[in-house]
């Protein structure tokens, strides 16, 4: 592994940890994503964070995701994450389930295998973190009862 790849892997581990230390399951292979999505219960809700190394992921996407997923009254059954740019095959497989234009960071909320909510990067970057959190809260309140 070259120095750049080693550095990015180390940085990504810290960023991944911001989610996994708060209950998110990291899906790091295509097989892990497929296995998870194909076994999920039809009545379960799954909140997916497509993680990224960019500043808007660090300052907005991850903190908002953690706050709402751990503190909101209505919460998803499951919380998972894939890391764009790091776990490329896993991210590509998750994007096949999402069926939206590739965007990272981004959020997806599923009921079973049905996408019920999606927030792409352009609705994260440059916004106030409280507005992002309120959008997630509204999606959870509507779909995670």
UniProtKB/Swiss-Prot annotation:
GO terms for biological process: cell redox homeostasis. Gene3D superfamilies: Glutaredoxin (3.40.30.10). InterPro entries: BrxB/BrxA. Belongs to the bacilliredoxin family. NCBIfam families: YphP_YqiW. This is Bacilliredoxin SAOUHSC_01436.
């Amino acid at each position: 592994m070259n120095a750049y790849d080693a550095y990015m892997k180390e940085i990504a581990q810290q960023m991944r940890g911001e989610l996994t230390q708060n209950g998110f399951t990291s899906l790091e292979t295509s097989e892990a994503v497929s296995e998870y999505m194909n076994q999920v219960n039809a009545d379960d809700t799954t909140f997916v964070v497509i993680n990224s190394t960019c500043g808007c992921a660090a300052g907005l996407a991850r903190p908002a995701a953690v706050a709402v997923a751990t503190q909101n009254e209505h919460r998803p059954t499951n919380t998972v994450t894939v890391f764009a740019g790091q776990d490329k095959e896993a991210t590509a497989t998750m994007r096949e389930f999402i069926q939206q234009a590739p965007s990272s960071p981004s959020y997806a909320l599923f009921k079973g295998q049905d996408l019920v909510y999606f927030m792409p990067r352009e609705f994260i970057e440059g916004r106030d973190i409280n507005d992002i959190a309120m959008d997630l809260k509204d999606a959870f309140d509507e779909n995670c009862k």
